């Protein structure tokens, strides 16, 4: 089973392997997906820069991919990782650190 990239980018929800905590949300195009499979490190597509980026390439806060899951429509991906350092560019463990309710 493969993701359906016919509509463009797919959301990639990144979760920590042990805790299942949601670390971040990013987007993958087909090239980012293939690089993630090949390197076992997360690659994403930046919508603002219109280019690929490798999580942790500059910060050292890398994500080692343990498994990938597709949803039932094949248009969203869950990436299970072993996170090294914080996942958020702000230095927080997760990008979802603002509690609303």
Curated annotation (Swiss-Prot):
Keyword Transcription: no
Pathway: Amino-acid biosynthesis; L-histidine biosynthesis; L-histidine from 5-phospho-alpha-D-ribose 1-diphosphate: step 3/9
SUPFAM superfamilies tied to this protein: HisI-like (SSF141734)
Gene Ontology BP term (one): L-histidine biosynthetic process
InterPro entries, A to Z: PRA-CH, PRib_AMP_CycHydrolase_dom, PRib_AMP_CycHydrolase_sf
Gene3D superfamilies membership: Phosphoribosyl-AMP cyclohydrolase
Enzyme Commission numbers on file: 3.5.4.19
Enzyme class: hydrolase
Cofactor note: Binds 1 Mg(2+) ion per subunit. Binds 1 zinc ion per subunit.
The protein's assembly and partners: Homodimer.
Family in the record: Belongs to the PRA-CH family.
Name of the protein in its database record: Phosphoribosyl-AMP cyclohydrolase
Origin organism lineage: Bacteria, Bacillati, Bacillota, Bacilli, Bacillales
Gene: hisI
């Amino acid at each position: 089973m493969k993701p359906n990239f016919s509509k463009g980018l797919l959301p990639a929800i990144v979760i920590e392997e042990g805790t299942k905590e949601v670390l971040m949300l990013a987007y993958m195009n087909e090239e980012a997906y293939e690089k993630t499979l090949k390197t076992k490190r997360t690659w994403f597509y930046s919508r603002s820069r219109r280019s690929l980026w490798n999580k942790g390439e500059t910060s050292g806060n890398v994500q080692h991919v343990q498994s990938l899951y597709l949803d039932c429509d094949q248009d969203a991906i869950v990436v299970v990782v072993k996170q090294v350092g914080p996942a958020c560019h702000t230095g927080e463990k997760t990008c979802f650190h603002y509690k609303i309710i």
